[in-house]
């Protein structure tokens, strides 16, 4: 089975993790701060605060921006549920904005959703393809709204020569095993704002900061969102290979792009010339004639050894959100969900693997 994505763990990764386990300090130590420092340097941002998950980092992002009961957050439904869930955890109401054909939030549809209660717009760089963040930031500034870039898919992505993670008030990265690098589980909060970074560090660790010697002060109600030194040792080792990971993913994606050009069964998402995507996902968008056969296609591919996935069921279609918000239908999000199928594209693959995936996909679609 070729999975749609997976981690790549080397002997060096295992060694640094084993070495970290032998250290006296297993959490809150130098490896955490070193990982934060190296990640900030890589992205080109002033502060990185590492946490135990991207969900934790999202929750802290909303809290640090002052999101509270009665505030509204605008975000995309084509994302993992945590993007919206974390806003609810902070007390906000969520308003979902429709997407474009590439799965990213449609910035042209955001203005109609803005009210005096809107506190934050949260964009998601779907599959590693950056959103039109400059347009979103310019819109937000006109209304006094803050912007979060949920870049969980996009560590290492570049747009107009600038790495993702620099422009928004806060950017979020994920280190889940299928993401560009892994710390087993983990996430990060990135910002150029000193005060937001100070608040994030407090929220990460119970709202407590040391004052002198043994003494400390709890100045706000925080959480235990700390990440371990063992996890960060793995993160440091993986970060050294990130550019190579992305290059390999792009090699596989380039093969697909060429192989699927003019395909009669589906379309692919074109990455703009000014962009280097992390290629966290390689989505194919099935033609409408296949939508009602998608489960059959999915099962057939799995049986033939091609691991596929769907990214994503619109968040508002979950029963929890239906009970909370009632029935919602955003036409482009619905179409995207009906069409989307993520095929294997990761740095553990060879071009021969990609050839097998492509030929198997064609075989299944021609016989369904």
What are these regions (language model features)?
Residues 1-25, 30, 344:
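N-terminal "arm"/small-domain region of PLP-dependent enzymes with the aminotransferase-like
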Residues 25-72, 86-90, 96, 162:
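Phosphate-binding glycine-rich loop
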Residues 33-37, 42-48, 108, 120-124, ...:
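PLP-dependent aminotransferase class I/II
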Residues 59-114, 120:
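Conserved PLP-anchoring active-site segment centered on the Schiff-base-forming lysine
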Residues 71, 77-79, 98, 151, ...:
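Nucleotide-sugar donor-binding loop of glycosyltransferases
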Residues 90, 142-143, 304:
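Helix C-cap/helix->beta junction micro-motif
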Residues 101-183, 188-190, 195:
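Active-site phosphate-binding strand-loop segment of PLP-dependent enzymes
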């Amino acid at each position: 089975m070729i999975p749609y994505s997976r981690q790549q763990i080397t002997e060096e990764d295992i060694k640094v993790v084993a070495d970290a386990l032998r250290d006296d300090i297993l959490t809150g130590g130098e490896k955490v701060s070193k990982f934060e420092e190296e990640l900030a340097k890589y992205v080109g941002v002033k502060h990185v605060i590492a946490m135990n998950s991207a969900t934790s980092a999202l929750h802290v992002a909303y809290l640090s921006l002052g999101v509270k009961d009665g505030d509204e957050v605008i975000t995309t439904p084509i994302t993992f549920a945590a993007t919206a869930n974390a806003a609810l955890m902070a007390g906000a109401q969520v308003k979902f904005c429709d997407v474009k054909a590439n799965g990213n939030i449609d910035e042209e549809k955001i203005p109609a959703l803005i009210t005096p209660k809107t506190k934050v717009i949260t964009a998601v760089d779907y599959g590693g393809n950056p959103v039109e963040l400059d347009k979103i930031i310019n819109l937000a500034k006109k209304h006094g709204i803050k912007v979060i870039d949920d870049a969980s898919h996009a560590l290492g992505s570049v747009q107009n020569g600038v790495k993702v993670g620099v422009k928004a008030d806060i950017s979020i990265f994920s280190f889940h095993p299928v993401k560009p690098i892994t710390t087993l589980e983990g996430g990060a909060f990135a910002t150029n704002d000193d005060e937001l970074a100070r608040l994030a560090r407090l929220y990460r660790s119970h709202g407590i900061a040391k004052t002198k010697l043994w003494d400390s002060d709890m100045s706000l109600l925080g959480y235990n969102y700390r990440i371990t030194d063992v996890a960060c040792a793995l993160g440091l080792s993986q970060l050294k290979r990130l550019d190579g990971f992305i290059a390999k993913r792009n090699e596989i994606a380039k093969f697909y792009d060429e192989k699927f050009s003019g395909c009669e069964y589906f379309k692919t998402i074109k990455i703009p010339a000014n962009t280097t995507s992390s290629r966290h996902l390689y989505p194919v968008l099935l033609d409408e004639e296949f939508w009602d056969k998608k489960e059959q296609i999915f099962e057939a591919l799995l049986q033939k050894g091609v691991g596929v996935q769907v990214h994503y069921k619109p968040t508002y279609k979950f029963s929890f959100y239906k009970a909370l918000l009632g029935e919602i239908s955003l036409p482009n999000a619905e179409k995207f969900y009906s069409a989307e199928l993520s095929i294997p594209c990761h740095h553990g693959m060879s071009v021969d693997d990609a050839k097998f995936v492509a030929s198997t996909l064609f075989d299944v679609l021609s016989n369904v």
